[in-house]
Amino acid sequence: EISECLVGSEMCIRDRDINYLIGGDLINQIVPSSFAARELGIPFFGIYGACSTMAEGMCLSAMLIDGGFADLILSGASSHYCTAERQFRFPLELGNQKPMTAQWTVTGAGSVLIAPNKEGPKVKYVTVGKVIDEGIDDGNNMGPAMAPAAVDTIYSYFNDTKDDPNSFDLIITGDLGKIGKQITED
């Protein structure tokens, strides 16, 4: 029950108050997210965006609320290191050495409640990225593969909104690794 997660909070929210659950993870068929949805009994949109799942869920939630289709949405993402290694790279049991360029998938989860006209952080704009494929196919060096899309999305955001990059404390992307980060900064 969701209300157990909010004990001590000023918000009194129960499962029945939430219109939709939007979530995903890095496992085939988003099984963990589907199991959570089964337990909660909230209408569920399962998404799979790999590194972008959390941001994707928040964007979709904000658009559904702004469009008047919902009043309260729970959006979340999870990942598991061992499962991601098995699925995208090599099973840990093989004992392969990770190269210095490899990213490390977190084992963790997070979720947010998105609602209209509430206090706290707001989703002010949504800029959806495009798939930009430069032909990089090294599963142990995905930063350079993701960097062109990150640059394009950041550029599109500032071009569309006319915001000043200097007015931000941070501009955060997914884990581009050392090489992908350098490509993005250049």
For the regions a protein language model found, what residue spans apply to each?
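Oxyanion-binding "anion nests"
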Residues: 150-180
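Short glycine-enriched loops at secondary-structure junctions
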Residues: 23-29, 79-80, 119
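Active-site-proximal alpha-helical scaffold in enzymes
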Residues: 48-75, 114
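Active-site loops and adjacent core secondary-structure elements that bind or stabilize anionic groups
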Residues: 11-12
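Condensing-enzyme catalytic core mediating Claisen C-C bond formation in acyl metabolism
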Residues: 1, 91-155, 160
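Short glycine/threonine-rich loop-to-helix capping motif typified by GTGT followed
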Residues: 33-37, 176-186
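Single conserved hydrophobic/aromatic residue that forms the stacking wall/gate
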Residues: 1-8
